[in-house]
From Swiss-Prot:
GO cellular component terms attached to this protein's record: cytoplasm
Primary gene name: pth
Keyword Hydrolase: yes
Compartment annotation: Cytoplasm
HAMAP family (UniProt xref): Pept_tRNA_hydro_bact (MF_00083)
Descriptive protein name: Peptidyl-tRNA hydrolase
Family: Belongs to the PTH family.
Functional note: Hydrolyzes ribosome-free peptidyl-tRNAs (with 1 or more amino acids incorporated), which drop off the ribosome during protein synthesis, or as a result of ribosome stalling. Catalyzes the release of premature peptidyl moieties from peptidyl-tRNA molecules trapped in stalled 50S ribosomal subunits, and thus maintains levels of free tRNAs and 50S ribosomes.
Tagged with keyword Transmembrane helix: no
Bilayer-spanning residue ranges: none
Database matches in Pfam families: Pept_tRNA_hydro
Site feature location: Discriminates between blocked and unblocked aminoacyl-tRNA: N12
Length: 186
């Protein structure tokens, strides 16, 4: 089995949010599921869309971003996992567009979805893959910016970042954390 048991893509449900900056984590998990010819089912108790592959669970919380922890709390109990068995994939305004950063634990960094997960699970020991969507343009409000779609001229970089995130996850599961981190920083 790979490094992680539960892979969560943070985002907001609904078509109006599909292509927004805030939903980049959601898009990565959707693509991971699609590439493995899996499909999502709704798990009402988990308040999520879930897809299973052997001992791996892909999760898209159907709560809005700020309540993402509710979905994970239930799934951790159901799957008998600890917070260290989760990989949360999320957007990060403090990273430049296209940059990826893995952290095994830490604060929410102001990200409301991650903050909800930390609060619900009562720990900061939650591995996460942060995907750069920044920087925040001068004069722009954060809430407005993250809920906007990417600009046309950013789309190639976004697709490249999604691909890098998928490659990182696949390497992580097959070859382990050390090799995946080396490839990520290369």
């Amino acid at each position: 089995m790979g490094v992680f048991h539960i892979v969560v893509g943070l985002g907001n449900p609904g078509q109006e949010y599909e292509k927004t900056r805030h939903n980049i984590g959601w898009r990565v998990v959707e693509e991971l599921v699609k590439r493995q010819n899996l499909s999502f089912k709704i798990d009402k108790k988990a308040k999520s869309k879930v897809a299973f592959k052997e001992k791996l669970v892909f999760v898209l919380p159907l709560t809005y971003m700020n309540l993402s922890g509710q979905a994970l709390s239930y799934l951790l109990q159901k799957e008998k996992c600890s917070s260290k068995d989760i990989l949360v994939i999320l957007d990060d305004i403090s990273l430049p567009l296209g940059k990826l950063r893995f952290r095994p634990k830490g604060s929410s960094g102001g990200h409301k979805g991650l903050e909800s997960i930390i609060e619900e699970l009562h720990t900061e020991d939650i591995p996460r893959l942060r995907l750069g969507i920044g920087p925040l343009p001068e004069g722009e409000q954060l809430a407005d910016y993250v809920l906007k779609p990417f600009l046309e001229e950013e789309k190639d970089k976004v697709e490249e970042m999604i691909l890098k995130a998928i490659q990182f996850f696949e390497c992580l599961q097959k070859e382990g954390i050390e090799i995946a981190l080396n490839k990520l920083s290369a």
